[in-house]
């Protein structure tokens, strides 16, 4: 599994037996701007994709990528919430090859699977729920700090963050070798952001990809998190939503 342009890299080298997963067409779908850049795939789309990957009922699925497990985390989150036993290979392809393990080239094809996914909204946060969460829980904005502060916005129409959201970049959970930082460091970072066991917490990013990685990091330390999948790309394209700028959660709030 890789970023949308990763198929060529996959064809050159991948873990033996691995099947390529397309982030844009199988782990997301195209929609209106008001839905965000990476709307969730329909249940039918995800199930058809999982069967194409060769997933059968009862299988353990392992997802990996070569970008800090960010895209793999999206697959993990989607499959986990639909009843699949799924794991993420820590460190991905880079760690695999760095430790001398074999790779193969070419297209990997698996026999059609028969998995039946559970239809579920577990773990997903709507735009209204995201707006309300800071009043009684923690909403994490996992984008880089300049985007959170509203100093720059390279993709979406408005810069800033959801009022009340706390900034904790997803990249801070990834070590230099592409593996997840250790559990003690994760717990300390989340605790500093006000997240401990029992906290209602959700994450958002630009379009719902990096936020899934934060949900994975939270699960690593035993904390269940929701993902606001529409994320900033939906919020900033929705008229009337207030926008906060600056380095604090409530910052300078402006009308949307």
Predicted regions and their residues:
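Cytosolic catalytic domains that perform sulfur/thiol-centered chemistry
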Residues: 1-256
């Amino acid at each position: 599994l890789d970023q949308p342009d990763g198929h060529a890299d996959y064809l050159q080298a991948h873990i033996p037996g691995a099947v390529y997963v397309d982030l844009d067409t199988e782990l997301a779908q195209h929609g209106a701007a008001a839905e965000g850049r990476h709307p969730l795939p329909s249940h039918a789309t995800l199930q058809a994709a999982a069967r194409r990957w060769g997933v059968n009922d009862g299988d353990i699925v392992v997802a990996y990528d070569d970008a800090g497990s960010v895209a793999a985390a999206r697959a993990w989150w989607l499959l986990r919430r639909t009843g699949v036993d799924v794991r993420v290979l820590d460190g991905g392809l880079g760690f695999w090859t760095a430790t001398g393990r074999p790779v193969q080239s070419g297209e990997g094809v698996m026999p059609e699977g028969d998995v039946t996914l559970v239809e579920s909204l577990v773990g997903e946060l709507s735009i209204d729920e995201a707006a309300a969460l800071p009043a009684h829980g923690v909403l994490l904005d996992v984008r880089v700090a300049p985007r959170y502060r509203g100093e720059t916005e390279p993709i979406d129409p408005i810069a800033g963050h959801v009022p009340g959201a706390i900034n904790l970049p997803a990249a801070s959970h990834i070590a230099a070798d592409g593996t997840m930082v250790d559990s003690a460091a994760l717990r300390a970072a989340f605790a500093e952001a006000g997240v401990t066991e029992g906290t209602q917490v959700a994450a958002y990013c630009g379009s719902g990809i990096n936020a899934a990685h934060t949900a994975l990091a939270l699960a690593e330390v035993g904390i269940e998190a929701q993902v606001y999948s529409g994320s900033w790309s939906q919020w900033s394209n929705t008229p009337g939503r207030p926008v906060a700028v600056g380095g604090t959660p409530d910052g300078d709030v402006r009308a949307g």
